Amino acid sequence: MITILATGKVRERYIKEGMEEYLTRLQKYAKVVYVEKERLNVPDGFIIALDEKGKQYNSEQFASYLKKKMLEEKNITFIIGGAEGIPNEVKLKCQEKIALSAMTFPNQLVRVIFLEQLYRACTIMKGENYHK
């Protein structure tokens, strides 16, 4: 199971719609759960922080990384911080950190971008034509 744990609520309708679209698409490939919390607490399982200082992957590399983690771990949680990022005490409990880009994105938009990248990775793993 893949859990996406994000700080704070999504406010913008267009962000919610984008997230709903990719969450629906992802159900064909994996059990993906999206959770919003005001305060982050680190659950059990393998925890990956989305952090601008984390390791960067291109889409094919991320698909390989995700496939490997899905084979090794029963539960994978990706943590997305709020406007202030992920608190240091939470980062210290994460096994790994990955970055979507060296650029900084609004935390609300990161949710859609990351869901799209998860979907893209799943289609790459299945050899489908979404990623060209």
Regions found by a protein language model. Give the residues of each.
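S-adenosyl-L-methionine/SAH cofactor-binding core of RNA-modifying enzymes
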Residues: 24-77
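Rossmann-fold NAD(P)-binding glycine/threonine-rich loop
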Residues: 81
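Structured adenosyl-cofactor binding patch, chiefly the S-adenosyl-L-methionine
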Residues: 91-132
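Conserved strand-to-helix beginnings and helix N-cap segments that scaffold or border functional pockets
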Residues: 16-19, 59-60, 91, 111
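Short, glycine/polar-rich helix-capping loops at beta-to-alpha or helix-loop-helix junctions
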Residues: 86-89
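Structured beta->alpha junctions
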Residues: 8-11, 51-54, 102
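N-terminal beta1-alpha1 ligand-phosphate binding loop
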Residues: 1-22, 26
